[in-house]
Amino acid sequence: MRLFERILGARFEALAPEVQALHRQVGIKEGEISLRASPIMQLFGFPPPCKDAPLWFGTREEENVAIWRRQIKDRELRSEVWQSGDLVVERMGVVTITSELVIAHGALSQETRGVRFMDLPLPRALWPRVTAREWGAAGTYHFKIVVRAPIIDVVLLAYEGWLRP
């Protein structure tokens, strides 16, 4: 049983088949991504803006920690994802976000429950606003993520795309 199956338990079956497949399998998936990253996010390793760029997404699990690797253009983004009670935690570089997984109409979204920067907890007022949604359509897995700056509400990062099953 993989990470999201463990966290969601029986609720996992309510996900669209394409979303279930992505979170059940390890290995490499291919697809496309369109990305808009602010200069500050580019400093954190995100590539410059691109449209319909090739995307390779690889997953593996080591001792209950999922390793996610995304190859976008010439950049590789790596994150570690694990379970904390009924929440999912993802660390990418110096930022760690704890989220609740929510299922509606077969789609999966994440609601932020905590943010750490350089392992220090941030007060809620300083949390970035993250909207993350995954869904299936016509046999393909789709995703859309938007990260907005706290207080000033400016888009720091937005990306969306798809992966083949």
Q: What role is predicted for each listed range?
A:
Residues V155-W162:
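Short, compact, well-ordered microdomains
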Residues R148-V155:
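A short acidic/glycine-rich loop-to-helix N-cap element
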Residues M1-V147, Y159:
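Soluble ligand-binding/transfer domains with enclosed cavities or grooves
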